[in-house]
UniProtKB/Swiss-Prot annotation:
Residues that bind FAD: 41-47, 106, 111, 114, 118-121, 169, 322, 372
Organism annotation: Streptomyces coelicolor (strain ATCC BAA-471 / A3(2) / M145)
Positions with a binding annotation for xylitol: 106, 320, 322, 345, 375
The reaction(s) this protein catalyses: an alditol + O2 = an aldose + H2O2; xylitol + O2 = D-xylose + H2O2; D-sorbitol + O2 = D-glucose + H2O2
Phylogenetic classification of the source organism: Bacteria, Bacillati, Actinomycetota, Actinomycetes, Kitasatosporales
Cofactor binding notes: Binds 1 FAD covalently per subunit.
Protein name (record): Alditol oxidase
Self-association and partners: Monomer.
Domain FAD-binding PCMH-type: 13-179
Biological role: Oxidase that performs selective oxidation of the terminal primary hydroxyl group of several alditols, with a reduction of O2 to H2O2. Shows highest activity on xylitol and D-sorbitol, and a poor efficiency with D-mannitol and L-threitol.
Superkingdom as given in the UniProt entry: Bacteria
Gene it is expressed from: xyoA
Length: 418
């Protein structure tokens, strides 16, 4: 049988596998895992590197054929969600039961399991990564057996943001809170020169979730997106002018795809993402990178980016600045430190983008910038150990749960070799 190929959402990566398996029951999944020599799980495909490449004659496993599980416990304010469920579906079910997630990423079309496995996040000085609300992980391990790791287990710090290296995540249990409404306000032209460390903190704390956007063609930020919970005050925003029309983070792109703006109230899950769930992206003419740094270095890091903006701008569609509260997941880019995140949406030209990524990484070295695991980066494996102080502990956990390395690949081995 010849190998099959699968491309990611952006089309910049082609995964090669012996087979693409789509089990329709947990029993079938357990049998397939036990019978396969090497396994990687294919989520929603919104990664931009080879994290899902099985290699070595391995198989790709899709959870899309499994029954969709979203079991809400309203009394406990928790939800058990299946490994193949995406945030848009989860949010609709949870909201219908009068509950909510505390945060979401910019795109609601991504899978829950894949998002928390790579440290994906939204924004907000008080909001942790998406993994921070996980209270329990259910895994199918290398021999096909099920292992449950819950908050309080000494292994839990390595079990959620795990890069798919421990087993197949078949379900996650998440903490919820009462449903709330939000409104979104967009402002334009926030000068970098007007920001000192205290003002930057004030800007990023001006609402429940704040994002700054720039194309680095000039100093400063072209757009500021404030997402306010209606049960919390917004005392004005004197640092930039209100937008005169609905905006898209990427100049020239249709704003109809974005969530409601101009302060129109709506459910949390229709305001926290930047993009509407009804808008289903079929492919993305883009590459993405992201680097997360201690928040106390935010302004210095922004000036370091501004110093190389003539290098960045020609291959950049937009750059988004967000904040993430510290969390306790060993491989989370926000592990142990309140964080500022700089996300880059590049043009779809790998040859042109990679040299710029390397130059950017050089500029951010003084700020201990951790790369997002699911995006384009070139940080050498040898530098990751200094960036992730619990990397050796994670390697020991992976070795204990998967001693033969069934769930590893070249990407994971490179990380663990750090």
């Amino acid at each position: 049988m010849s190998d099959i190929t699968v491309t990611n959402w952006a089309g910049n990566i082609t995964y090669t596998a012996k087979e693409l398996l789509r089990p329709h029951s947990l029993d079938a999944l357990r049998a397939l895992v036990a019978d396969s020599a090497r396994v990687r799980v294919l989520g929603s495909g919104h990664s931009f590197n080879e994290i899902a490449e099985p290699g070595d004659g391995g198989v790709l496993l899709s959870l899309a054929g499994l029954p969709s599980v979203v079991d809400v416990d309203t009394a406990a304010r928790t939800v058990r969600v299946g490994g193949g469920v995406r945030y848009a579906e989860l949010a609709r079910v949870v909201h219908a039961r009068g509950l909510a997630l505390p945060n979401m990423a910019s795109l609601p079309h991504i899978s829950v399991a894949g998002s928390v496995a790579t440290g994906t996040h939204g924004s907000g000085v008080g909001n942790g990564s998406l993994a921070s609300v996980v209270r329990e992980v259910e895994l199918v391990t290398a021999d096909g057996s099920t292992v449950v790791i819950a908050r309080g287990d000494e292994r839990f710090g390595g079990a959620v943001t795990s890069l798919g290296a421990l087993g197949v995540v078949t379900s996650l249990t998440l903490d919820l809170e009462p449903a709330y409404e939000m409104e979104q306000h967009v402002f334009t032209e926030l000068p970098l020169a007007g920001l000192d460390p205290a003002t930057f903190e004030t800007v990023m704390a001006a609402a429940y979730s704040v994002s700054l956007f720039t194309d680095w063609r000039a100093p400063g930020f072209r757009q500021v997106w404030l997402k306010r919970r209606t049960d919390r005050p917004l005392d004005g925003f004197p640092y930039a002018a209100p937008a005169a029309e609905k905006m898209h983070p990427v100049p020239g792109m249709p704003a109809v795809n974005c969530t409601e703006q101009f302060g129109v109230p709506g459910p949390w899950h229709e305001r926290l993402p930047h993009f509407r769930a009804e808008f289903t992206p079929s492919s993305g003419a883009e590459l993405q990178s992201e680097y997360l740094m201690p928040r106390e270095h935010a302004l210095a890091a922004l000036h370091a980016m501004d110093a190389i903006r003539e290098t960045l701008a020609p291959v950049l569609q937009t750059c988004e600045i967000r904040t993430v509260a510290a969390d306790a997941q060993w491989l989370s880019p926000a592990y142990g430190r309140d964080t500022v995140a700089a996300h880059f949406t590049w043009v779809e030209d790998t040859a042109a983008v990679l040299p710029v990524v390397r130059r950017l990484e050089e500029a951010l070295v003084p700020f201990a910038a951790r790369p997002h695991w699911g995006k384009v980066f070139t940080v050498p494996a040898g530098e990751l150990r200094a960036l992730y102080p619990r990397l050796a502990d994670f390697g020991a956990l992976a070795g204990a749960l998967d001693p033969a390395g069934k769930f590893t690949n070249a990407f994971v081995r490179g990380v663990l070799a750090g």
